[in-house]
Amino acid sequence: LVILVFVLNAFVFFLFFSLSHYLGKFLLVLFFMINSVAVYFVNTYSVIVDESMIGNVFNTNYEESSSYFSFKLILYIIILGVLPSVYIIKAKIINVTLKKGLTISSLALLLTIVLVITNASNLLWIDKNSKQLGGLAMPWSYTVNTSLFYIHKYKKNEKEILLPNATIKDNQKSVVVLVIGESARRQNFSLYGYDKNTNPLLSKKPNVFHFDATSCATYTTAGVKCILEHTNSDDLYEILPNYLYRNNVEVVWRTSNWGEPPVHIKNYQNRDVLRKDCKGEGCDYDEILLTGLKEQILASKKNKILIVLHTSTSHGPTYSKKYPPRFETFKPVCNSVELGKCSQTELINAYDNTIVYTDYILSSVIDDLKELKEFKSTMIFVSDHGESLGEKNLYMHGVP
């Protein structure tokens, strides 16, 4: 298979160089540079570069992407990207006659056919593992999947299908706080039987119920969209906040994250907006989402209120930087972006501390709601997806 991919790559780039020497060099340099970064992530985090991973790439921001920066990444870019690119730019192109070009192309195609026939007995295995194999074949893994990502994104950006209008039958003041977690897996919540006490506050709260849930995807946009949809469908139905806002419910979206599906409401508040009224250490962490929350609820002129808190608490790879120092309950912790360099204990300790901090945030929301005596209130917590913490050498969103 490696030889087959090599032959196909050689054939394709031979065609590019036949069209234009400059085009061929440009594409080779471009692909070597991108390949160097892709190979780094494949080797370091055991990711597969498929369509969902492309979704992760295009739904990131500077804060998240900068957290992956390391000396090892620079080495990969220099050795696998810059040095080959310099050689390609300086290399002299040898012109071949049309006859020789056709001969080379024919031989490449013939060799490809021979290799396919030779691997005929493995076709079932190849078909079964095509997604994983395709995600490792550079540069086609990211070129093909980027095209698929934008094709599917274009389809999803069509006009929303409106749901039937809601009928609100009472005037009782009610507020629901939906907290959307980031990369928080239930396996590490002591409420679900985890042997480390990661939920010291919630475990003491009355009327706290936990349930099993399975995410629809491993990147934020698809995961959050699935949470907010009324049904799992390829059709573009309006999501919960858009639906309730259209039906005269007060909807507030507060976020320290990014990548949510299109939210069509008036009160969308990101970290920059919330920071204006925030004071203290918590403003650098997800506590910022609680800034003035009670006051905003009380100031509403509507009886029905939905508050969405979109957190980023357990997002890697810098788990140890996602919570204030006082929440570092489990030690020692992993402080490196190269998670494979940390021991399993250090990595899990850092991640578990993010769950302890999540526990504090959720407990604080409950306490705030209890003070709103005139409101019936509910808090719901659900994460967009889980996380890989070195199991089978997989990290973060290791397997789509």
Label every PLM stretch briefly.
Residues 1, 218-221, 342, 346, ...:
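Juxtamembrane/transmembrane-helix boundary motifs at the membrane-water interface
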Residues 1-135:
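Transmembrane and membrane-interface helices of multi-pass
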Residues 14, 134-140, 291-294, 333-379:
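A long, amphipathic alpha-helix that forms part
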Residues 16, 90, 97, 103, ...:
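Short, motif-level signal for alpha-helix interfacial/capping segments enriched in acidic residues
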Residues 18-24, 45, 243, 247-253, ...:
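Catalytic cores of PAPS-dependent sulfotransferases
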Residues 119-178, 183-335:
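Active-site-proximal alpha/beta segments of enzymes that process anionic O-linked groups
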Residues 189, 366, 391:
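Active-site-flanking alpha-helical
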Residues 193-197, 375-400:
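Histidine-centered active-site microenvironments of extracellular/periplasmic hydrolases
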